[in-house]
Amino acid sequence: MKIHFVGIGGIGMSALALHEFFSGNEVYGSNIEETERTTYLKKLKIPVFIPHSEENWFDPDVLVKTPAVHEDNPEIIRARKENVPVENRLSYFKVILKRENREEFAVTGTDGKTTTTAMIAHVLKELNRSPTAFLGGIMDSLEHGNYESGKGPVVYELDESEETFSEFSPNYLIITNARGDHLENYANSISRYRAAFERISRNSDLVITFAEDELTSHLGNVTFGVRKGMYTLEMRSASRSGQRAIIEKNRKRYAELKLRIPGFHNILNALAVTALFDSLGYDLEEVLKALERFPGVRRRFSISYHDPENNIYVVDDYAHTPEEIKNLLQTAKEVFENEKVVVIFQPHRYSRLEREDGNFARALQLADEVIVTEVYDAFEEKRPNVSGKIIWDSLMNLGKEAKFVDDLSRLNSVIVPRDNTVFLFVGAGDIIHYSKKFVETLQSSTNSPSRVSGSKR
């Protein structure tokens, strides 16, 4: 079969393309711009065309499109004209899962999907279960970063931004939380949003939920939480080299959980995974050993640069909701106790910024300094009076030192390199490109007297 992927450079779409390619199908696709994934696909000899054009056409049997691609896309128009079936990403993914007909592990929810899914895939690999994994991020221990083909269970994350996620039927499901992100895709109805989680829960044999989540805690056969739930945490300690916590099961001391990666939110992600595998009867000791070796996911508190002489760090993180940003900054303050934390934040989607109102500023005020850029639109139409400046205004009202940069080409001239400082580049858009440019600046001026000397807090 010949499959045309429109938006093939996205992290989710590229995983589907890789699966179909390694399943023996003829695969090609297009993207609006080059990405790390388009470069990788080309190395595998998968044809990728930049940008979209009606000439990117080789008589496919089906066209698969990302939700970011609209009906006015020239390739969609041509497919309609030539009566080629057009499938959305999730609807086509259901076709794949039906064809594979295997045991399924899935993760959905607002925060922590990618890391939790990666943990499940990692544990199954370590336990020689040979999973096929579809990941919404890059984990270096997966053969293709966001995808690996195996003969065992299928592991995937389900993006709740599309209401059709509720039509899936995984055997085992973790719902990390549900905070109403993407509510605009549910006609701004919280009851409709809640109903989608209820539907997918009914479709699953085992559901693990966060006991402290208002919308979904009641849906779980098994629950986890800080103080509430079947699986809880008794105490936790953390350092730069990792963290550990005592797990209680039904209020009794049960096991010790160790992780290399930082962040209390990651202990909760790992607790959910532990609850899942323990409930399924896996060897708990082997599961915990595997989690201790979990390498993490790129752009999840990824240190991309460290100058030990001047004590400067650059950290990249995909956080793009207020809760994720709060978790990120709490982690940064825990890991970097003596350094100043400067956040460079790129808001993602006008709809999210408008809906969350002052929540971003309240999360960002945990930083010592904040630089806010203009919104990364993610193919949304610009909305009147919705701008990154909203966050800057709120931060200033909170008395937080902040700057607003409306032109990203000026960003690196605004960031002042200084000693004893952690620079956090945060967002789900293209902020990573500017992080790389900043690292290049630091590397070229390591011994420059222009660097500002900052005192440790």
Curated annotation (Swiss-Prot):
InterPro entries in alphabetical order: Mur-like_cat_sf, Mur_ligase_C, Mur_ligase_C_dom_sf, Mur_ligase_cen, Mur_ligase_N, MurCDEF_pg_biosynth, UDP-N-AcMur_Ala_ligase_MurC
ATP-binding as UniProt keyword: yes
UniProt GO cellular component terms: cytoplasm
Catalytic activity: UDP-N-acetyl-alpha-D-muramate + L-alanine + ATP = UDP-N-acetyl-alpha-D-muramoyl-L-alanine + ADP + phosphate + H(+)
Enzyme class: ligase
Compartment annotation: Cytoplasm
Binding positions for ATP per the UniProt entry: G109, T110, D111, G112, K113, T114, T115
GO biological process: cell division; cell wall organization; peptidoglycan biosynthetic process; regulation of cell shape
Keyword entries, A-Z: ATP-binding, Cell cycle, Cell division, Cell shape, Cell wall biogenesis/degradation, Cytoplasm, Ligase, Nucleotide-binding, Peptidoglycan synthesis
Annotated EC: 6.3.2.8
NCBIfam families: murC (TIGR01082)
Protein purpose: Cell wall formation.
Name of the protein: UDP-N-acetylmuramate--L-alanine ligase
Organism (species): Thermotoga neapolitana (strain ATCC 49049 / DSM 4359 / NBRC 107923 / NS-E)
